[in-house]
Amino acid sequence: MAVNDCFSLTYPHNPHPGDLIEVFRPCYQHWALYLGDGYVINIAPVDGIPSSFSSAKSVFSTKALVKMQLLKDVVGNDTYRINNKYDTTYPPLPVEEVIQRSEFAIGQEVTYDLLVNNCEHFVTLLRYGEGVSEQANRAIGTIGLVAAGIDIFTFLGLFPKRQGAKS
């Protein structure tokens, strides 16, 4: 599904246990894994702020709590879609194993890092046995481009020299 195919809770498609749920927040996506009966597993900051706001704070946290929550509470007023986008690259684990792994993780405190251990890494690890995040890879690429640009400007002498420096 393309981003234009996002749907809201008013007209939801029916996710199946083990499906990855992509929630569209302003400026980024939050990820959860559907468990069934309206529940998802996801990671949220350790403090108890509301689910629909917790993902923004988690970007700046180093600790997160694995939670089982209602999909509607995690989504809030945002939109979401089912997005099992890595199925062609990584074969999904059997649903029973995904659910078992998920249930074991509920309530655990985990390390959170936007670039190497974020909510997308968490749910893809449950579904595929591999923690993958396209969103983190894009962020790493952007950081690399900015750093390279600064190096080029510095090398070419385009940044002004410090005042009072001897030539």
From Swiss-Prot:
Residues 20-135 form the LRAT domain. It catalyses: a 1,2-diacyl-sn-glycero-3-phosphocholine + H2O = a 1-acyl-sn-glycero-3-phosphocholine + a fatty acid + H(+); a 1,2-diacyl-sn-glycero-3-phosphocholine + H2O = a 2-acyl-sn-glycero-3-phosphocholine + a fatty acid + H(+); 1,2-dihexadecanoyl-sn-glycero-3-phosphocholine + H2O = 2-hexadecanoyl-sn-glycero-3-phosphocholine + hexadecanoate + H(+); 1,2-dihexadecanoyl-sn-glycero-3-phosphocholine + H2O = 1-hexadecanoyl-sn-glycero-3-phosphocholine + hexadecanoate + H(+). The active site is at H30, C119 (acyl-thioester intermediate). PROSITE patterns: LRAT. Residues 160-167 are lumenal. InterPro entries: H-rev107_PLA/AT (IPR051496), LRAT_dom (IPR007053). It is found in: Membrane; Cytoplasm; Nucleus. Belongs to the H-rev107 family. This is Phospholipase A and acyltransferase 1. The gene is Plaat1.
